[in-house]
Design a protein with these regions (language model features):
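Cytosolic juxtamembrane amphipathic/interface segments immediately preceding
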Residues: 11-22
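Transmembrane alpha-helical segments of integral membrane proteins
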Residues: 10, 143-148
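The cytoplasmic-loop to transmembrane-helix boundary for the fourth helix
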Residues: 119-141, 161-162
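Membrane-interface helix termini and inter-helical loops of multi-pass transporters
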Residues: 146-156
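Short helix-perturbing small/polar motifs within transmembrane alpha-helices
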Residues: 83, 112-127, 165, 169-181
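Alpha-helical transmembrane segments and their helix-membrane boundary motifs
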Residues: 20-33, 122-126, 157-169
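Hydrophobic transmembrane alpha-helices and their membrane-interface boundaries in multi-pass
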Residues: 23-102, 107-115, 132-137
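Juxtamembrane or sensor-core-proximal signal-transducing alpha helices
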Residues: 4, 8-11, 166-190
Length: 190
């Protein structure tokens, strides 16, 4: 499977072990996105939240094409920010649409700095952490002023909460596994 991922990436990235590993990690995350987006879109449709499903599909497409932007000459940092930016905008839209901080998907904001750290290191992670933090404060203020709608309730909220916890746990484990693999590759390169 990794050979397939490697065939997508430009050979020029091989010169720098860190960039090569970051590009591989980005490709794995894009593949996971490609597998999960149809399932998520179907789940939102079954819950009567077609608008959410369409936004997930749109953001997912952007995230899925990021490895191909590397082949088109985009630097790894720009591809990383394209991927994380699509994830971030998706989470902002979902938080606003599904009820602010109480939305069952709000915890997924944690993936923005986690993915940025995995692919780019501490600086991008701190930048995305600051952006996520400011967004959470803005959502809190909007929520307190009554600007946002009421959070979901009933079966849809319960299903989304369950799916969010399980999905976030699985992706956290994947990110940790990729980070561990990247650290091992870096140690071998020394």
């Amino acid at each position: 499977m990794i050979k397939l991922f490697d065939s997508i990436l430009p050979a020029a990235l091989r010169a720098d072990t860190r960039q090569w590993q970051a590009a591989r990690n980005l490709t794995v995350l894009a593949a996971v996105t490609a597998l999960s987006v149809p399932l998520l879109t179907a789940m939102y449709h079954l819950l009567g939240l077609d608008a959410v499903g369409m936004v997930v599909l749109t953001a997912g497409i952007v995230m899925m094409v990021t490895p191909f932007t590397l082949a088109a000459g985009l630097p790894i940092a720009a591809a990383r920010d394209l991927f994380v930016g699509a994830l971030f905008l998706l989470k902002v839209w979902m938080a606003v649409y599904l009820g602010g901080l109480a939305a069952p998907t709000t915890s997924w904001f944690v993936l923005c700095p986690a993915v940025a750290m995995l692919i780019g290191g501490l600086r991008p992670a701190l930048l995305w952490s600051g952006l996520v933090g400011a967004t959470l404060v803005a959502l809190f203020v909007l929520d307190r002023t009554g600007t946002l709608g009421a959070p979901l309730d009933g079966l849809a909220a319960t299903v989304l909460q369950f799916a969010s916890v399980v999905g976030l746990m699985a992706l956290s484990v994947l990110i940790l596994a990729l980070a561990t693999g990247a650290a091992a590759v870096e140690r071998r390169a020394r």
